A protein has these predicted regions:
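Extracellular beta-rich repeat passengers
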Residues: 1-150
Length: 150
């Protein structure tokens, strides 16, 4: 597992295999990552909070909970996403925004979820530009929004 806290900068490549908790956790940071590969996490594969994030390419498989979790007033942009085997592929919550430009999601009951988890925050918003997911694989709580442009 890797955890960045209050980090700023660019990362070329991250590879994580067999994590017993969240595989990659980034908090209070401003990070641009070119490529992320994660396999086999007991909890979330990628967990982002309180920051601004750009991920160019992410390929994740076998996430115990969420493939990607964006929360606590974060802004995140994902250019190319592949997620295989997660409960929720991409969850955005608690006054956060995520833009997902190109996603392929397989074996995940919920592709995208936008909601408020913690009382002190508002809902969340996801903008999806291209995906193989269907509308019935979306979860949107009142006060949150998902814009789907296929």
């Amino acid at each position: 597992a890797i955890n960045f806290i209050r980090a700023k900068g660019d990362v070329k490549t991250v590879n994580i295999l067999d994590s017993t908790s969240d595989a990659f956790d980034i908090d209070f940071s401003h990070i641009n990552i070119n490529q992320v590969e994660i396999r086999n996490a007991k909890n979330d594969c990628l967990d982002l909070s309180y920051g601004n994030y750009l991920i160019n390419k992410i390929n994740i498989k076998n996430c115990g909970d969420k493939g990607i979790s964006v929360g606590e007033k974060s802004n995140a942009v994902f250019k190319e996403v592949k997620i295989n085997h997660s409960n929720i592929a991409i969850a955005v919550k608690d006054t956060s925004f995520a833009k997902v430009e190109n996603s392929e999601i397989f074996h995940s009951p919920i592709c995208f979820a936008a909601y408020r988890k913690k009382q002190e925050f508002a809902g969340a918003k996801i903008k999806i530009l291209q995906t193989n997911c269907k509308n019935e694989q979306l979860f949107v709580q009142k006060g949150s929004k998902i814009d789907l442009e296929i």
